[in-house]
Amino acid sequence: MAHLKINGLVQIRSTNRSKHTRASQWKEAVIEIVERKQKVNLVVSFKLEERRRVFQLGDNVTGVVVSGELGLYHLDLTLRDDTSLLIDKLSSADVEHLKSFLDSSTPCESQQPMEPMSSQDDLESSDPFCGEHQEAACGSLNTTPESGTPLSRKMPLSMSNTTGGQKRGEKQGRKRKTEPSSSSAEVNKDIPKENTPDQKKKSRRYYSRNRGGKAEKAVTLREQEKRSNWKLEPAFNSKSYGRANLDGTILPIATCSDDRDVSIFGLEIITHNGVQSLPDPYLNQLKREGFPNLGNTCYMNSILQSVFGIPTFAKDLLTQGIPWEKVSYDDLIMPLSQLLVLKDIRDVEIKGELLTSVKKSISTVADTFSGNEQNDAHEFLSLCLDQLKLNMEKVNAMWDTERRNTCAGSAGTKRFVCPVGANFEFELHSSIICEGCGEATIKTEVSNYLSIDLHHGTKTHPLSIQKSFDLFFTPEKIEHNCEKCKNKNSVLKYTLRRLPRVLIVHLKRYQVTTDLLPVKSEQPVEISKYLNISSHCHENRKLPFPLANTSPDVSQGMMPGIFNQSMLSKKVISESCDPMVLQVGSSVDAEIQSFQIMYEDEDASEEQQQRGLESGSMLEPELVKTENRILRQKTSLATDSMMGDGYSFLPMLCEPLSIQDPGLAEMGLQEVPENPEFKNYEKINIYGKSDGRTNTELSKLYQNHGSRIKGLFLPASLASVSSQEDPEKDLSRSPELQEDDPHSFAFGSDDSKDGEMGDDLQNYRLVSVVSHFGSSPNSGHYVSDVYDFQKQAWLLYSDVQVFESSDPSIQENRLNSGYIFFYMHNEIFEELLKKASECKVLSTSKEEKRDIDYFSTLLNGLTYILEEF
């Protein structure tokens, strides 16, 4: 038998005499299948521990279940002694090979079973075990546990509605219901099939200790690496607050707890040769990574991705010159800003530490977020915005006090704009008019979101976000004691007095039953692409804050100020065209700081960058805290995990930088000419002189004879590197990405009016949707669809995984799950879209930039020598 060796995440489970299941931690390991003395063994060698475990295969195997979702697969191997070996995060090729080896090593079922033989070179006594256990795989190797239908030994990868012994789902005070996966079974996710008595018994056995049936496991961050061909790094153990409440248990493995909703991301299940499998999805998984799940924190990840996807919010938070050295790390604004800067790096450990700090900050005001339980995304959003607003008030108060003490008698002091108030805050004007005397009671409320009721629609008039929004502003008769005439009949009417840049609409999908239990309504609601609010505005309405036409003041708020020196001295490189992402490094091809990417020459020497970082800010010891220890230590690892595909949320700042602080000039920043057509290829020659004419000729020379020059001058190491494909070519090939096509999305019935609504000043356009899959706020899974301005396409964020939809259909896939909707003012949307189209300075790939850098230095030097002669 050929030798097989693959990498994966492994968990070993065993059942003791008391029928209690013990499960080890998930660990990175090398899985090998070897044949010794006519016996086939599976050897698990743990990477971080000098030990291994050996499991005999053959007739010792009682069940093999392969399952997966969105390109990731896991295999559940069950042995006769009730030991289960779970191998997760496998690629399709690895799981095919492993399944083939396991099938070929299993004797015919007609043979007499032998006694279970499971040996090990080293006991796993050091592993902490937990009381939680997922369903084990039962049945023969070639039989699906659900239906008993024989499968071919060379069967394709199974993508059944249930995951076999590893059923993914939630438990809401009822027994599990599974669906058969045989070819004769019709896939119907709305009608769950009943379990057989044996299956029910096993479900009770393995889920009796499930605390609330949480939707996701408390995982180490490295478990969420997407591909096995990526190098697996040591697992990061995130801090867990309130862990004592878990009673020594871990949560079951799942990413979605709704056992009925199989294709939650719009993936259809097809039947092929009697086995349900996954077709090529329309979702294109990107190399970029989202936020790791710390254990039921998908609600936090989805909200943060949606908020970070608002370019104006990012600009207001990062470009005002906030004195970060004065901000406490315990305040939410600090880890939130750091996370925004580093959102697109691949190192999940750094992002995991920052997410833990964000969670801890929110937990100080709401204990419900201190544990590992699933929480409501809307509640987290509300608390997050409130805390951020309070932090900005604290910064302004501190800044005013300091300026008054240092600049006594000055005319005025600078106040920082609150990103929450400038982007999400609106004024809701309510008037209660007495029907008897006409006396009006006026009140104005300030809010960050609008919660609307979920009404019932009909087949002929289906419910939509627009219709629900209109119903909220419909005058309503209420009982109100009039102080003037004592009449109790009044009319309540709402109007919008001040409009926000981004209107957050919260759809009330949860209702409380008579037993005081929250129940989610899955009533379909069509998602309106445009939201027309013109008829609901006050006569003296105030338009949203316009986009600032002046250059941002980065004299004190440049990105290095958010981090301490020890962290910045290490390499933090995010290969992203995100203008807000910190890009610091000493390598030859590392770009300069994030804002320089759009305004400045793309190159800076290592000495210039390091000097700039050291002079950027002298942070107080307040930032050098224990909570930031791992962040500082692990920053150097970000170089190896940098972004490769260069997607971003928007280079929204295209105007030249206005440098006001002389100290900033020492950071290697120079003012860019105001000509927007100025080429980004201008370099600094080796003698420190800038020659625009030479660099223009360099650009033409490289464009016309680039391939020939590469062969003549490039070292072998560089010449052998093939250039990556220009991202702009992808845009030219994809008509739907070239322009903002109002008909490129399959939205609801309101879209017939989209063309007429587009130019209305009171129209808002959808830019993000947070969806919940599940039947309870305490379980399920949250995802977020965010419009990417740079790519001009929709991106789906599901924790660490990021997908691009080539043919988006948000209306179809979020019909029953859409929960929170972000609508941007159409005028601002168009302006940001225009700026994003103009900002194309990062269209060159990493290898092409390296080549240009090399030629720039070489040819500039040659030009200088020729001029001297």
Swiss-Prot record:
Catalytic activity entry: Thiol-dependent hydrolysis of ester, thioester, amide, peptide and isopeptide bonds formed by the C-terminal Gly of ubiquitin (a 76-residue protein attached to proteins as an intracellular targeting signal)
InterPro entries given in the database record: Papain-like_cys_pep_sf, Peptidase_C19, Peptidase_C19_UCH, USP37-like_PH, USP37-like_PH_sf, USP_CS, USP_dom
Name used for this protein in its record: Ubiquitin carboxyl-terminal hydrolase 29
Biased composition regions of type Polar residues, renumbered to the chain: 104-120, 140-150
Superkingdom, taxonomy of origin: Eukaryota
Loss of function: phenotype: No visible phenotype in normal conditions.
Tissue-wise expression: Predominantly expressed in brain and testis. Highest expression levels in adult brain, especially in the cerebral cortex and hippocampus, and in the forebrain, face, and limb buds of midgestation mouse embryos.
Active-site residue list: 298, 781
Chain residue ranges for the region called Disordered: 104-226, 723-754
Localization per Swiss-Prot or TrEMBL: Cytoplasm, Perinuclear region
UniProt cross-references to Gene3D superfamilies, sorted A to Z: Cysteine proteinases, Ubiquitin carboxyl-terminal hydrolase 26/29/37, pleckstrin homology-like domain
One GO CC term on file: perinuclear region of cytoplasm
Keyword set, alphabetical order: Cytoplasm, Hydrolase, Immunity, Innate immunity, Protease, Thiol protease, Ubl conjugation pathway
Keyword set includes Cytoplasm: yes
Effect of residue 298 to A: Impaired ability to mediate deubiquitination of CGAS
GO molecular function, one term: cysteine-type deubiquitinase activity
